[in-house]
Amino acid sequence: MSLLAQLDQRIRHHGGLIVSCQPVPGSPLDNPAIVAAMALAAEQAGAVALRIEGLANLQAVRPLVTVPVIGLIKRDLPDSPVRITPWLEDIDALAQGGADIIAIDGTQRQRPASVSALLAEIHQLGKVAMADCSSLDDALECWQLGAEIVGTTLSGYTAEETPDEPDLALVQCLSVAGCRVIAEGRYNTPAQAAEAMRCGAWAVTVGSAITRLEHICGWYNTALKAAVCPANEQ
């Protein structure tokens, strides 16, 4: 049975939650052993797959879990805004590290390696390709180029301002177009994730709301401060 067929079964039985275990850089949680523990806990809690950034984290996670792992490497390049798995060498490293699915930036931006070249390298190594996209045009082009999965990962993150809500409209458009789409980006409540599935998502990736303690505390602190400020002003 193919990896995607196996994932289809997991999604039908468990509901389609993918957990992204990517701590805030520099956080006390930003440690491969802690990332591996989070990943194992997520699997035990019913995650159908995991999204792991960085080779050290991938190598720590892979021996502990049985669910598929989406691997990526983030880089800050001086001559390109593309951050997610920009180099062909990154794909080779992720494949050797045990990633089942390799995620790349699928946007139409200046980059060191073309999307088509990255997809070809992923397939040459026998892995499944996921394209992290920002728009309908991005995703449809990546789908036509052979990406088995397209994600709404970068929707709202390539412009100056990032919206608060997830891009459910993009999920629905991609589903109608026949794409296998993973909803990702600002799915901070179970209700939002469920709505993405109703819009046609194949699965939903949740990161900050599960594995980024600083973000979760920030949401609560903002709400609590807003609640007490009127009382303090009286």
Curated annotation (Swiss-Prot):
Give the top-rank taxon of the lineage listed in the UniProt record for this protein.
Answer: Bacteria
Q: Which residues form a coiled coil?
A: none
**Keywords tagged on the record:** Carbohydrate metabolism, Isomerase
> Which reaction(s) does its UniProt entry say it catalyses?
an N-acyl-D-glucosamine 6-phosphate = an N-acyl-D-mannosamine 6-phosphate
What is its pathway? Amino-sugar metabolism; N-acetylneuraminate degradation; D-fructose 6-phosphate from N-acetylneuraminate: step 3/5
Q: Which GO terms describe its molecular function?
A: N-acylglucosamine-6-phosphate 2-epimerase activity
Q: Name one GO cellular component term.
A: cytosol
Species source reads: Klebsiella pneumoniae subsp. pneumoniae (strain ATCC 700721 / MGH 78578)
Q: Which cysteines are joined by disulfide bonds?
A: none
Matches recorded under HAMAP family: ManNAc6P_epimer
* Cited Pfam families: NanE
Stored NCBIfam families:
PRK01130.1
Q: Which gene encodes it?
A: nanE
Q: What is its EC number?
A: 5.1.3.9
Keyword field contains Transport:
no
GO biological process terms held by the UniProt record: carbohydrate metabolic process; N-acetylmannosamine catabolic process; N-acetylneuraminate catabolic process
Recorded hits in CDD domains, A to Z, give: NanE
Q: What does the UniProt function comment say about this protein? A: Converts N-acetylmannosamine-6-phosphate (ManNAc-6-P) to N-acetylglucosamine-6-phosphate (GlcNAc-6-P).
Report TM segments: none
Its name, as the record gives it, is Putative N-acetylmannosamine-6-phosphate 2-epimerase
Q: What family is it from? A: Belongs to the NanE family.
